[in-house]
Amino acid sequence: PGTANNPSYKATGISVVLHPSSPHIPSMHFNTRYLQTEQEWFGGGIDITPCLPYDDEKNYHSSLNEMCNKFNKSYYSEYKKWCDDYFYLPHRKELRGIGGIFFDYLHSDDWGKDFEFVQAVGSFFHNYSLFVINKLKEKSWNDQEKNIQLLKRSRYAEFNLLHDRGTRFGLETGGNIDAILMSMPPLAKWE
């Protein structure tokens, strides 16, 4: 948007992707960005991809809902649906993980409030990821659980290479390839 008369743009963002060694700790992704053309907007999101049964899913979603409601009562349901639709692998007919929120083109009449929301998304990710890591980091795993993790990570890689807008944007605009592909899991397996 906003490039019809002038194709130049400015973009900045923060992306964090965690692919823990432990198959009990889900892969976690956080991204926020600000883009400026003749228009300006924020985007971003949080999603997690457990490999094994995950007993905190309900708490995760209710906490995200609570955070979103501080800014706009419609954000959670709207952004959760966007996340579920976005992180879907059509060739596998499955979701990449258990979702979260995903938003783009956030530009209300209050830039400061929009920025506060983006900051809250970052704070939520920081606090939630520490909670999960500290809760599960000592839990042991076996070879079968590690194998399940590697298979689940193959879905993560497939999504990023085939469908991710950020990956495509970075590759199409001549970005740093190593930085663009940093979100890939370090190991994955296909059967």
Predicted regions, residues:
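A domain-level signal for the structural core that forms small-molecule/cofactor-binding pockets
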Residues: 1-191
